[in-house]
Amino acid sequence: MSSLVSTPFTTATGVQKKLGAPVPLHSFLLSRRQPAAGAGRGRAAAAAIRCAVAGNGLFTQTKPEVRRVVPPEGDASRRGVPRVKVVYVVLEAQYQSSVTAAVRELNADPRRAAGFEVVGYLVEELRDEETYKTFCADLADANVFIGSLIFVEELALKVKDAVEKERDRMDAVLVFPSMPEVMRLNKLGSFSMSQLGQSKSPFFQLFKRKKNSGGFADSMLKLVRTLPKVLKYLPSDKAQDARLYILSLQFWLGGSPDNLQNFLKMIAVSYVPALKGADIKYDDPVLFLDAGIWHPLAPTMYDDVKEYLNWYGTRRDTNDKLKDPNAPVIGLVLQRSHIVTGDDGHYVAVIMELEAKGAKVIPIFAGGLDFSGPTQRYLVDPITGKPFVNAVVSLTGFALVGGPARQDHPKAIAALQKLDVPYIVALPLVFQTTEEWLNSTLGLHPIQVALQVALPELDGGMEPIVFAGRDPRTGKSHALHKRVEQLCTRAIRWAELKRKTKEEKKLAITVFSFPPDKGNVGTAAYLNVFNSIYSVLQDLKKDGYNVEGLPDTAEALIEEVIHDKEAQFNSPNLNVAYRMNVREYQSLTSYASLLEENWGKPPGNLNSDGENLLVYGKQYGNVFIGVQPTFGYEGDPMRLLFSKSASPHHGFAAYYTFVEKIFQADAVLHFGTHGSLEFMPGKQVGMSDACYPDSLIGNIPNIYYYAANNPSEATVAKRRSYANTISYLTPPAENAGLYKGLKQLSELISSYQSLKDTGRGPQIVSSIISTAKQCNLDKDVPLPEEGVELPPNERDLIVGKVYAKIMEIESRLLPCGLHVIGEPPSAIEAVATLVNIASLDRPEDEIYSLPNILAQTVGRNIEDVYRGSDKGILADVELLRQITEASRGAITTFVERTTNNKGQVVDVTNKLSTMLGFGLSEPWVQHLSKTKFIRADREKLRTLFTFLGECLKLIVADNELGSLKLALEGSYVEPGPGGDPIRNPKVLPTGKNIHALDPQAIPTTAALKSAKIIVDRLLERQKVDNGGKYPETIALVLWGTDNIKTYGESLAQVLWMIGVRPVADTFGRVNRVEPVSLEELGRPRIDVVINCSGVFRDLFINQMNLLDRAVKMVAELDEPEEMNYVRKHAQEQARELGVSLREAATRVFSNASGSYSSNVNLAVENASWTDEKQLQDMYLSRKSFAFDCDAPGAGMREQRKTFELALATADATFQNLDSSEISLTDVSHYFDSDPTKLVQGLRKDGRAPSSYIADTTTANAQVRTLSETVRLDARTKLLNPKWYEGMMKSGYEGVREIEKRLTNTVGWSATSGQVDNWVYEEANATFIEDEAMRKRLMDTNPNSFRKLVQTFLEASGRGYWETSEENLEKLRELYSEVEDKIEGIDR
């Protein structure tokens, strides 16, 4: 649960001393310096640099005036000399100092034929309206415009609009690689690119290539080298203008002050009319290597790695460590433009720091955007094929292939696999100055996160450490020395894993316990943690790791970790591995004093015996298994509402101090999803020394097993705890099946179908109705009173609806049991997963779903069958059952034919090739030939089953242990997407370095299509439940993981509700929306209140910007109120609040930056709340922080009154379920974000809103009420013998899973009141009244069983469960009995 975190992160007073800075802090915190009197121009420049906190809410407060260079005034000898004005726009600031130096030198020449005025803009500055006006004003009298690397669409369009107006008037317009819209502005004499994308000439065809920007860049560089020589001898003006364009590109890529001087001279004399025929001489471009090796102390750039190594070996300035032949070698990837422009101070600092720490370096650079070739050419021994390096650190921040434009991740991954070393991607600040970054609670600018954090992750990049800042005056990069020191130390620590022997390596395995209780040690989603640890350690032992003393069984391992052997009496403590006295703690933990604000002096009362800090766990040889301390606020979550800057407690800090400084781990392995380290307070992305995750993890390489279906929180762990996240499989899914009365109902329906025409129909229907009522189905299916005479068609309809409901229960997928690392599912266990993979159409691969193929066989469309079944049409329900059973049968037969007698998959590819194309011998055809679907399309079936064969191989593959060992050996772990393997089988096999997706790539077209279907069904359902009226407002939740899995479906739902559509740019990135006309929409625009999870906020800040812009755009549309509820409510709220319409239209809310969850779940899980109002206040206090697209750099700002007014208009609340693995009661996130009862309290009429859940876990997407979904969840999981017996097979951890479902059910009662009494009654009958079950639970995990009993009593005490006094008395007796049993165990 990402609920383990704090309130807004604020830098404590003493923290500034810790912040990495290359120079005294005041030298770049310029806004805090008072200008001297009469400072004149210096004052204007100082005023141009304002602190972000006091700024206008944009990220960069630097003004372009710092980049304005004008000819010196008062030079009498140069009066009357023409003035040439040049305006340039660039992505990054490294050209600023080089351009400035070039222009100043030109203007200082006493014989100059022209005076140059140059002003530069960073593209991101153009978001600010005042700056944009200045830009347009500068263009109005400019001679020349230059643009480079303009790849952000909304800003590219602003540049295009401004330059286009002046293009014909200007003397020259030069745009170097940028978006096509801007490239078309190019104009140099007769040379133009206005037809870019349409011309047939090779030159333009080159620019059209978009599929591989790395290849594009390489081709560009070759063209730049050769074309001027060819064009020089062509007589036409057009050829000469094209030649000068290419020369311009050479000068620009050369980047040095000399090159830029000659560039400006060439353009001025060639194209500025006042200078035609002037005596201006310019030299040819000085060409640097396109790619090579650069070292600041080397005499030259090297194109041959052997030459570089020879020079390196003969250096006399090196320390003794560097002369050691076994010294680690770090490869560095650098941007050529920083080197040629002389903006390389940050690179020099990293190289010097690595060498000072005893690591050799090979710093490589490339001029294009493709580093895959240079990494092979310079970092790999051409003879042996082995890498020269032990780790690679990219200092560019960009993806390895493609830079900020179009990436080629497969090409990058192939190159990195050949290197096979850890790959770290560190970041220089691009869009912020150092001061702005330090002051920002968000951390990095969202555009930088998208381009330089998210994209490198797709290559397998780790550890986004900010190592360089930017000077606001000069634009030059400077090293942040503490960050550089950490980056270099961590890189060397990863490299050491490559060099150390297995026997000497030390590993700290960290497990979690949440909520804090002995019954919860080893908490992790879907994972049997101790069985998995035991499996891992057995394997590591075989490999040569020292795990001395490991017990003989996983059960014994649990006992040794969770029981304190030294306790004289019952102890709540776990096994104590180390007692750390306060003096030792303070001397080893540099930030210990900062924790005292929240926790007082150490040792405190958490993980402490009053004198020492206690580290819980157990050591086996060189492996330590430790229990991560809890966040600390669990027992009193209300404290978080009043604590200004939450922090970890002393015990938490002591744990990580022990791991790094005392145990001296070579690596830490966080075991399972998930702990609280990555959710500690600090910047969202791009942390500073003052951020707690950064301080806690220190310099230890972090490997983290994370559930494959949770890429969003895995990404938070990757970014905030510098983790190499390795995915593990969730347990194989099975169909829920039927039991007890539900099974009896199924049999009665079969009887009705065969006997309904024999006269026994009415009698059987009467039995069906009474049995359905006994099964509590009467709330889901409207049933008549028993004994009422029904005509045949009504009998069919009632039976059809009951049949559809039990089919829905029977076919629901549920994970059974818990996964064990190193134990992939057998082939037969994978059948249900394959059936669900086969149930989806995949039009992009021309694969038809199996239900679709079978429905077509009998002349039906599968969507029509789904709809008919939903309505209870008996014939359609029966046909759907036949299709479902035939699908399962065909796939089961196929799987059986690909496995050996042990149930293992053997050589699927060969077996498939022997099956395919042999008609009736194809196993799926053999099975279908016995059904009504005998004529199914063979070709479509072959295509589908070929795909399913590949999926089967992936499902049963076992890479989880292998990838862990690769990481421990300092090798590269292949990256892969996280998500739902049913929607996206590329998630498989697990064991990949899990990543999310390009945040600017969503929502996709497919997601938009699915979203429309769900929104239309939701609105229709609400109209039915609401007297035919549309809801005016829907309050909904956006989750990070869901949007990754579905490529933005719920994001697209919001856009469709308010009636806008996303618009993708040339590169497929979505940064813009446009309104859909009311005619096309066919309904009013629905108002929304959007609660973004903290993880969504971290991962998709660009999409929050998009949503806020969309809502405000809709509020400002001139439309009737009855057709635009956004505008209607915004106008009402503007009047009530006394604010502008735009501000009143604030609808995008989340936690404060660095904070997660409403903490309602913490309160429920720990039973630490008094009444529901307290929970609602907690929700409002923590979730009322708004995002403002007009001030994106301001972070999340508290707007509680706006939040309350918006919620008060909600007619419905809404959430999405997108995966069969996680449902409403599986995790506490869902009820933690549910505002149903809160909305009822805020509404003026006091009416409870309708509550809906969209279920897209199957091809037949549904919209159900919340209460329907809770009932379905209870029937298929908590009360289902198949599910709870599957959990009981996992022993200790299985009991905890059962208890967790009941606790989460109570959570839903607390926030929504949508849990029926019978659910608690049946749960009590199942787990308490059944004596055998009760004994099993108590014996297997008495601590979790105690919590189960306590939760039943709490449900009754809070009025959620009405039951007999006899039941309650039994529970009270049981509670005493289990307390005694626990004391007996511990004594």
Curated annotation (Swiss-Prot):
Mode of membrane association: Peripheral membrane protein
GO MF assignments: ATP binding; magnesium chelatase activity
InterPro entries the UniProt entry points to: BchH (IPR011771), CobN/Mg_chltase (IPR003672), Mg_chelatase_H_N (IPR022571)
Biological pathway: Porphyrin-containing compound metabolism; chlorophyll biosynthesis
Alphabetized UniProt keyword annotations: ATP-binding, Chlorophyll biosynthesis, Chloroplast, Ligase, Membrane, Nucleotide-binding, Photosynthesis, Plastid, Transit peptide
EC number per UniProt: 6.6.1.1
Chief place where the protein resides: plastid
SS bond partners: none
A Pfam family: CobN-Mg_chel
Broad enzyme group: ligase
One annotated GO biological process: chlorophyll biosynthetic process
Catalysed transformations (reactions): protoporphyrin IX + Mg(2+) + ATP + H2O = Mg-protoporphyrin IX + ADP + phosphate + 3 H(+)
Transit peptide, residues from-to: 1-50
Intracellular or extracellular location(s): Plastid, Chloroplast stroma; Plastid, Chloroplast membrane
GO cellular component, as recorded: chloroplast; chloroplast membrane; chloroplast stroma
Protein family per UniProt: Belongs to the Mg-chelatase subunit H family.
PANTHER family for this protein: MAGNESIUM-CHELATASE SUBUNIT CHLH, CHLOROPLASTIC
UniProt subunit comment: The magnesium chelatase complex is a heterotrimer consisting of subunits CHLI, CHLD and CHLH.
Protein function: Involved in chlorophyll biosynthesis. Catalyzes the insertion of magnesium ion into protoporphyrin IX to yield Mg-protoporphyrin IX. The reaction takes place in two steps, with an ATP-dependent activation followed by an ATP-dependent chelation step. May be involved in the plastid-to-nucleus retrograde signaling.
The protein, known as: Magnesium-chelatase subunit ChlH, chloroplastic
Organism: Oryza sativa subsp. japonica
Source organism phylogeny: Eukaryota, Viridiplantae, Streptophyta, Embryophyta, Tracheophyta
